[in-house]
Amino acid sequence: MSSGQGYVASGRPLLFDVVSVQSQVVYGHVGNNVAAPALRAHGLHPGIVPTVLLSNTPHYPTLHGGALPLSWFEGYLQDLQARGALQALRAILVGYLGSAEQARVLGRWIARIREVHPQVLVIVDPVMGDDDHGLYVTEGLAEASRECLVPQAHGLTPNSFELGLLTGCEVGRVDQAVAAARRLLAQGLRWVVVTSAAQQDCPPGQVQLLAVTASQAHLLRHQRVDTAPKGTGDLFCAELTAHLLAGASLERAVEASSRYLVQALACTRLADSAELLMPSRDPAQAQAVQWIPLEN
């Protein structure tokens, strides 16, 4: 591909509402492969920045690819600004990263963007591990995410394992998870939404999400769907971003995102699909969820 030297673009730049920084695969529905279509389904125009480029997710028997070279990754971010694509930017969505160096570069870039566009919403899904598999990124990346990305975020969507990792707290019960989330709020976050939350207090056959702000905490429950495709957190976070940008409150955004995610899981299970499916957004197919206000 040509370097572009000697070429001067004419006309108005292509403007992005959201910059989504996360993984990309050739086969599968994870990372930007689900975030981009989810955001577009809400009428948004995402700029897609890959952190890793893989043939598929690592749970398959073969895997090719890896993290993008740091110079490429940094160049992608710089060139979005250089092309004038961020003049109407409304949100930055961060998911899976490929290295600690990427986290540091991204943290500095977000800080510069926030200086120019202070209204931009920054949502970080700190993809680092889960209760079933433990930590599946390097300890260096986990530390860099904690130091460089959490301070830049307005909202965070860790799972229960990641909440414990970020805070060093016990998070198995609802009261413990709320206290841990509020420790993160003390770092400048507006809210924390914990997925697969407080599993010691979760009724059988249910899944819990916990939405925590400085003044309120709410627990959301829905039926567990008997399927476990990859990419559910990526889809939830993209949906959450879209609903917040549409003006929904945090509680309503979490509720709508959860309803669609359960619908997607039910569709995936019905089709016996190895990968997460994204059905059309049919209100008639919306799944039941239950909100439980907690004492503050």
Swiss-Prot record:
GO terms for biological process: pyridoxal 5'-phosphate salvage. Pathway: Cofactor metabolism; pyridoxal 5'-phosphate salvage; pyridoxal 5'-phosphate from pyridoxal: step 1/1; Cofactor metabolism; pyridoxal 5'-phosphate salvage; pyridoxine 5'-phosphate from pyridoxine: step 1/1; Cofactor metabolism; pyridoxal 5'-phosphate salvage; pyridoxamine 5'-phosphate from pyridoxamine: step 1/1. ATP binds at residues 125, 157, 162, 195, 222-225, 232. It is an enzyme of class 2 (transferase). Substrate binds at residues 23, 59, 234. B6-vitamer kinase involved in the salvage pathway of pyridoxal 5'-phosphate (PLP). Catalyzes the phosphorylation of pyridoxine (PN), pyridoxal (PL), and pyridoxamine (PM), forming their respective 5'-phosphorylated esters, i.e. PNP, PLP and PMP. PANTHER family: PYRIDOXAL KINASE, PYRIDOXINE_PYRIDOXAL_PYRIDOXAMINE KINASE. This is Pyridoxine/pyridoxal/pyridoxamine kinase. It comes from Bordetella avium (strain 197N).
